[in-house]
A protein has these predicted regions:
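N-lobe entry segment of adenylate-forming
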Residues: 1-61, 65-78, 154-157, 167-170, ...
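Conserved pre-ATP/AMP-binding loop-to-beta segment of ANL
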Residues: 44-47, 163-170, 180-202, 209, ...
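Conserved AMP-binding/adenylation subdomain of ANL enzymes
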Residues: 221-260
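Conserved AMP-binding
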Residues: 92-95, 114-118, 243-248
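Structural core segment of the AMP-binding/adenylate-forming
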Residues: 100-103, 107-177
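Conserved AMP-binding/adenylate-forming core of the ANL superfamily
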Residues: 45, 49-103, 120-125, 175-177, ...
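Conserved AMP-binding A3 loop
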Residues: 59-64, 190, 198-222
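Conserved S/T- and glycine-rich ATP-binding loop of Class I adenylate-forming
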Residues: 88, 105, 136, 197, ...
Length: 260
């Protein structure tokens, strides 16, 4: 996979790297199609994600399964009216549905806004109005869903809230129940251009209100250096990054460069 995007992959010195390392950026690059689906076609049984929790549950997902589930998630989000340019906040802690959701939203050309589960009502209201958030997908924990419920009356752009369970409040969509009954995913004719926004983070707001920091669809390619030359990962490496999915390190530490 790496060779698709980098002409020279090994180097004999720092000078060699500085002189010859170059990322080849495809037109209309989309991490969902050009990396996840490409792996699913080339090596469908290759392990993509090893997920576990503090209850001892353990699931290994192959790239074939990631394609299947991200397509299914994309179709589900399409059924809720999500498409290119729509703002979607993810408050999913370390749930595997985060990987389904972020890749599905990339496939739709939507804008992903990862957020920490520490957000309270005022934090959600501020972010929803600043970014015109259309949908929130959250972990089904009462402390999270309560803050979202309290924020909704002051967040007029939010049309849907989806819970991945186990708790699904009244008025929230049930991800796993509704997800099972969607039609086959139809890939958008033109999901994105390279300079479209794909990922948006809010800063911590240490000297005022949080600021929005946008990344375009080519952003994952920038983390080839992270996965290959900083983390020193190889083809079948197993890598652990301890980061809540609301933080930036979740995507640059356990998704983009690592899967390329």
């Amino acid at each position: 996979m790496l060779e698709r995007f980098v002409g020279q992959t090994s180097f004999v010195s720092q000078e060699d790297f500085k002189k010859n390392f170059k990322v080849n950026v495809p037109e209309n690059f989309n991490f969902g199609y050009d990396v996840v689906d490409a792996w699913a076609e080339e090596e469908p049984e290759k392990k993509a994600l090893c997920w576990t929790n503090d209850k001892g549950e353990h699931i290994d997902f192959t790239f074939a399964e990631m394609k299947k589930y991200t397509d299914q998630t994309a179709a589900y989000f399409q059924s809720l009216g999500i498409g290119r340019g729509d703002m979607v906040m993810l408050i999913l802690k370390r749930r595997y549905e985060f990987w389904f959701s972020i890749i599905a939203l990339h496939k739709l050309g939507a804008v992903v806004i990862p957020a920490t589960h520490l957000l309270t009502k005022k934090d959600i209201v501020y972010r929803a109005n600043a970014a015109d958030i259309k949908m929130i997908v959250c972990a089904g924990e009462e402390v999270i869903t309560k803050h979202i419920e309290d924020a909704l009356p002051e967040s007029p752009t939010i049309e849907h809230v989806v819970s991945v369970g186990p708790f699904v409040p009244s008025g929230f969509h049930d991800f796993h129940k509704e997800w099972e009954n969607v039609p086959a995913f139809v890939r958008p004719v033109h999901a994105n251009s390279n300079d479209d926004i794909s990922l948006l983070y809010f800063t911590s707001g240490t000297t005022g209100n949080p600021k929005m920091v946008a990344h375009d669809f080519t952003y994952p390619l920038g983390h080839i250096t992270t996965g290959c030359y900083w983390h020193n990962l190889h083809r079948d490496s197993l890598h652990l990054t301890i980061a809540d999915t609301g933080w930036g390190k979740a995507v640059w530490g356990k998704l983009y460069g690592q899967w390329i």
